[in-house]
Regions:
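Nucleic-acid endonuclease domains
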Residues: 2-86, 91-212
Length: 212
């Protein structure tokens, strides 16, 4: 299941045009998949320094995603169980890739949601927090360039992703594998080697912070 799409050629946009676009997003709410995707496509090729209105690029890991959320779509980032665009049921994911001699590959895992052991154990896949939050994702990609400042980075593709049936069957099986260990009190035994697409991994200050 390829998550990185073909790169588009960066376009040159004058600063004054960018400023008008950024001003236009204030007070705007994106409530349909079509309007969300259209807005996402409009950022392609624009240097992120021209998008960042709040200085987020200097704040460290995750800053690029926050810039897109705050300065481009005009909403406050959150880590709640709802999708980023709840009316449309769309979750935003901004992800880097690397270009090497063997082609393009993802730079890092795509973190989907927090596993709440106290709530998820009695749910089905279709009623799970993962499915509620991530069944449709807006994936925005950029090339990670180690020798360039983040302000030079540009979003080069934006696509709406819904899982194909053949992949969805594997993802559902992976979810059931993870939850079976949770239900039987073996959550501490969870390993990324248990599954194919969907994995349980620690993310945070220590191993007690677990995400899917």
């Amino acid at each position: 299941m390829g998550l990185v799409q073909q790169c588009a050629r960066p376009m040159v946009v004058h600063n004054e045009i960018i400023e008008k676009e950024l001003e236009a997003v204030e007070g705007t709410q994106y409530v349909t998949k079509e309007s969300i995707l259209q807005r996402a496509q409009e950022i392609k090729g624009i240097p992120l320094r021209d998008v960042d209105k709040t200085g987020r690029l200097a704040t460290g890991k995750g800053a690029i995603g926050t810039v897109i959320e705050e300065s481009w779509f005009g909403y406050t980032p959150n880590s709640e169980s709802e999708p980023d665009f709840p009316e449309a049921g769309v979750e935003l994911k901004v992800t880097p890739y690397l270009r090497g001699k063997n082609g393009i590959r993802a730079k890092e895992r795509l973190v989907c949601n927090i596993i709440n052991y106290m709530e998820e154990y009695d749910k089905t896949f279709q009623t799970s927090a993962f499915w509620h939050k991530c069944n449709t994702m807006l994936l925005m990609s950029y090339e990670h360039l180690a020798d360039k400042p983040k302000g030079d980075y540009r979003i080069d593709e934006a696509v709406l992703i819904s899982f194909p049936e053949e992949d969805l069957a594997i993802i559902e099986h992976d979810w059931e594998t993870i939850m079976e260990k949770v239900r039987t009190g073996r959550a501490h035994e969870l390993s990324e080697g248990d599954t194919l697409y969907l994995a349980a991994c620690t993310k945070g200050a220590n191993a007690s912070s677990v995400r899917q």
